[in-house]
């Protein structure tokens, strides 16, 4: 039986370990993510953050330990099943289909809950039903349009994704992820490449997503954004957790300052 703390948390990580040859990308990671929280995961390059996301989404299988999401053991490695169960992800490098419209792109996310592969979801989002739109399709379209309004993309819904400016492409990727109706959203460096104005807008977007009832794990190098938005922060270094606490604690932790933040960090 799962422990009470595990059942009450959105996500519980227990002794999670991943090796590549003799290298420990993650070494016995322990971590709890509270439901409805913005929980940041920070650390230098090579600390294990991307490996952690790949384990959560089923891209990799752990060598030891377990992942418990909403009280259920995540022992199915298929990424499509993780999506159906309520886990979605964005990527540091934007991954869009450049020749699809903005609306079609978000529709792919909606269809990912019904189809076992992104390619089948792509076909369902792009191809028109032969005898008119089914009720389920109309509902998905309505949900996609609501998300476009939330992200301020309604006016560009018929443009190709490749025609959008960089900041709007970031918004579009977030909209597509939310279209899968996740309860846990993994954000991989969403502020990468953004200017200060776009980063401030991103701050508002992330808190808005949290206010929709979505728990968020944020991997990000912009420490001003991380410290200003996070409820809790876990710090990794060489695959090992070196600190876990509220932002004020993390800023003062000498291990974090030495390994990652540095003495002269300005927040």
PLM segments and residue spans:
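Glycine-rich phosphate-binding loops of nucleotide-dependent enzymes
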Residues: 2-267
């Amino acid at each position: 039986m799962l422990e009470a703390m595990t059942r009450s948390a959105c996500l519980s990580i227990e002794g999670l370990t991943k090796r590549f040859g003799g290298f420990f990308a993650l070494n016995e990671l322990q971590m709890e993510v509270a439901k409805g929280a913005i929980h940041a995961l920070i650390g230098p390059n090579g600390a294990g953050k991307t490996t952690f996301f790949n384990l959560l989404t089923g891209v990799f299988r752990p060598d030891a330990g377990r992942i418990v999401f909403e009280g259920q053991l995540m022992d199915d490695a298929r990424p499509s099943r993780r999506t159906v169960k309520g886990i979605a992800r964005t990527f540091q490098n934007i991954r869009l289909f450049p020749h699809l419209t903005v609306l079609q792109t978000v529709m792919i996310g909606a269809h990912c809950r019904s189809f076992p592969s992104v390619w089948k979801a792509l076909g369902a989002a792009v191809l028109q039903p032969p005898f008119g739109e089914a009720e389920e399709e109309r509902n998905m379209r309505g949900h996609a349009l609501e998300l476009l309004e939330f992200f301020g993309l309604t006016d560009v819904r018929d443009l190709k994704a490749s025609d959008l400016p960089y900041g709007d492409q970031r918004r579009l990727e977030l909209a597509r992820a939310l279209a899968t109706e996740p309860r846990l959203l993994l954000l991989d460096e969403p502020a990468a490449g953004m200017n200060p104005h776009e980063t401030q807008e991103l701050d508002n977007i992330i808190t808005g997503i949290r206010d929709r009832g979505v728990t968020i794990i944020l991997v990000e190098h912009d420490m001003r954004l991380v410290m200003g938005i996070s409820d809790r922060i876990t710090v990794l270094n060489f695959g090992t957790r070196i600190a876990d606490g509220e932002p004020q604690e993390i800023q003062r932790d000498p291990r974090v300052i030495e390994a990652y933040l540095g003495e002269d960090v300005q927040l």
